[in-house]
Amino acid sequence: MCGGKQEVFDRVKPILEKMGSSIVLVGPVGSGNMTKLANQIIVAVNIAALSEALVLATKSGVNPENVYKAIRGGLAGSTVMDAKAPMMLDRNFDPGFRIELHIKDLTNAQNASKAVGMELPMTDRVLDMMKKLQEEGLGKCDHAAVLRYYEEQENIEVKR
């Protein structure tokens, strides 16, 4: 997720390739940052949707692990799902990417959207959920703990 001039990108690309596997020049200076914000929106909304679905399954009496296994290979499957569903099912909210950091990124996305006159209703909703969890002392937990927001709303716990 790089922004800048092609000639500069070409010079530093070998160094960047040692730090990551997907090195893409997305546009001029600032484009890399906007791409990072877009990524964080997608991750946050995916985690919230996964949480909502697993709580719905659990509350409906369906085994959430079986739901995950059934849908992970289809269109709803994703890298986010494969990374976060097992954590959710194991009740493992040890930080990989903390809620407090995702709050920062989503706040930056909100600010960027305001600068171009756009609303981000799904981002706003997930950000509110994360802020509530942070207020409850879960800010240092992995963002998979968004599951806890839904669990609290429905007074139910998702687990294997």
Language model features: what each stretch is:
Residues 1-35, 43-78:
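Internal alpha-helical scaffold of NAD(P)-dependent oxidoreductase catalytic cores
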Residues 17, 158-160:
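ATP-dependent carboxylate/acyl-activation modules
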Residues 29, 33, 77-79, 83-144, ...:
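Interdomain hinge/lid region at the active-site interface
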Residues 68, 149-150:
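Sequence-level detector for tyrosine residue identity
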